[in-house]
Amino acid sequence: MVCLSRENFAVEGKRKGTPCSSLGAMAITDGRFNEAQVIARLKEIFATSDPRISIGIGDDAAVVTGGPNQILTTDMAVSGVHFRTDWSSAFEIGRKVTAANTADVLAMSAKPDFLLVAVSLTGSETIEWITDLARGIKYEADLAGAHVVGGDISRAGQLVISITAIGSTNKPITRSGAKPGDGIYLSSLTGWSAAGLAMLNSGSTEVGEPAEKALSEFKSPTIDYGFDASNSNALCDVSDALVIQAAQMAEASKVCFNFDLTKIQASAEFVELEKVAQKLNADIWSWIFAGGEDHALLATGTDLPGLLIGEVTQGAGLANVPAGVEANTWQHF
């Protein structure tokens, strides 16, 4: 049995919040709703009868039964940095932040099991907005097969969402196992999120399936939870950009990642993504290799599922990266 707990920060420097699984910290009262109403709503949304959860939301900490090798990861999303409330609905934001965490668990060839969610609200949110955020988290968690077992709510000057994900696996797969002769695979083509961001930044009113997919992938990315990476030699999530994380895998494995652009161009997704790039007069290769915010998995091995995009060879670094591609993903510092 594992007890999952997280000490809360002092609220406004005055008092401690209640511990993690109570999903409460400070009273949020402005005439529209109060803390008790929020907690009651969240308990209803995240209710579960999973036998692995002995104690869930409502006590000082959650008590769960973990798997053989537990995988732990955390990811924080800040309004104005990772998402914008004028671009995305609360439901979409909930999905997006959850996906960022579940993807990191999948990138270790693990299954997401439990989530702890901490949210700071500004006080301007409505109970409906908070409910939709929780429903978005719940929706993505259900897709991943995970359960929210606790968290924390506080009030601050900026909307911040932090999720800790706990997963399990019989055999963790890291970035350092790539071998010469391995194929390089993506669970799905990258670049869609960057395309969606470009559309929003440009004010594009483009319609049609490719444009709708680009916007959707930016607002709430689609993760292939059925992608079987168990036979991979090396594995990584590419949310920081394909060119960045391929370089990290190559360095960790002491090999060279040799890309085959003709294989990428031959994919059906490339043809669709190219339609959006042409409408915006954008460089599709920059989107694919350097766009970031895609939660595809990058794997090496033999006869793996997904899109074959190259081969691991002896040497170091990356080969055949398209000319002019530079990683342009967000750098916090």
Name each region found by the language model:
Residues V2-C3:
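Targeting/processing segments of secretory and organellar proteins
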Residues C20-F333:
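Helix-biased detector of long, well-ordered alpha-helical tracts
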